[in-house]
């Protein structure tokens, strides 16, 4: 039996939840879902240009886990851009920086790990990602 997924620490929530090709109504486009923690990995590594070890530390994951998140995010973005699909940012297993843990449903302090032990709630898109 697989262990429960751990929360990834996210410092930034996107202001928009969907990007799409210009001139085509969203209702006519297929979508690719990017999880919030995947966008955070892209932001830390590619936008802020941090070293992978620093990115992993900020997200409170191991370096191999960070690498897997980053590779998955880049593959999804490349697929969406090359095939003209919309990109929707939603879902995932994450907690906001030193703030609110959506899974534990309470405030967490700076440096406090999210050790949520409840039942992991998988979204429909999580089930299709495997």
Curated annotation (Swiss-Prot):
Q: Which InterPro entries match?
A: UPF0251 (IPR002852)
> Would you say which domain of life the source belongs to?
Bacteria
Q: What HAMAP family would the database entry show?
A: UPF0251 (MF_00674)
Its family?
Belongs to the UPF0251 family.
Identify this protein by name: UPF0251 protein Swol_2090
